[in-house]
């Protein structure tokens, strides 16, 4: 609402920041802990072949659907003429493509169980996992820096187009990189399972 009815954040940098922030904030809070809740019953998941692969694909589809919530909530900024629909759509594609690709890498390295009765916004399991902190910061800082560089050399429409193409390339190839994550996760399964068991 502040972005819609106020001119405080009308600068290019702040516009980019708030749009990307609103789209990636759910994933940065929830998806960054991927496999944390599943650590409570990881032994059961390992019983059947490719259970984890199906789980990762389901999580990806769910979070792609979840992006509709912030996208719809950003529509008043388009109606008021503050932001363009093309900007929001290109950033949404970039988020479900490249940003989710980066965040999903945590499935390989997370090995701390999160109690099933913990709040979603709790910091449980994050305070000692520096990789989660680095990834959380990078999904905010890197895209904003990248789009600022693009916009300094190209028009806004072209910059948004490049962001959309990058995002779409990762969306189209999601089965490949999710399988790669699954393969790497299975290579570390005993180390991760030990971590999940010891942190219950």
Model feature map: region roles:
Residues 46-51:
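Short helix-to-coil transition segments within interhelical loops
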């Amino acid at each position: 609402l502040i972005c819609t009815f106020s001119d405080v954040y009308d600068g290019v940098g702040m516009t980019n920041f708030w749009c990307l922030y609103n789209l990636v904030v759910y994933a940065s809070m929830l998806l960054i802990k991927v496999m944390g809740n599943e650590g409570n019953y990881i032994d059961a998941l390992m019983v059947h072949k490719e259970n984890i692969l199906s789980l990762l694909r389901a999580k990806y589809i769910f979070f792609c659907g979840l992006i509709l919530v912030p996208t719809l909530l950003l529509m008043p900024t388009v109606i008021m003429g503050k932001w363009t629909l093309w900007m929001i759509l290109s950033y949404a594609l970039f988020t479900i493509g490249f940003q989710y690709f980066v965040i999903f890498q945590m499935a390989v390295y997370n090995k701390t169980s999160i109690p099933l009765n913990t709040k979603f916004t709790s910091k449980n399991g994050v305070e000692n996992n520096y990789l989660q902190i680095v990834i959380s910061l990078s999904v905010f800082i890197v895209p904003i820096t990248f789009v600022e560089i693009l916009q300094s050399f190209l028009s806004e429409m072209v910059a948004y187009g490049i962001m959309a193409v990058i995002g779409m390339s990762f969306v189209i190839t999601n089965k490949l990189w999710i399988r790669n994550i699954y393969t790497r996760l299975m290579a570390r399964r005993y180390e991760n399972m030990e971590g999940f068991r010891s942190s219950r």
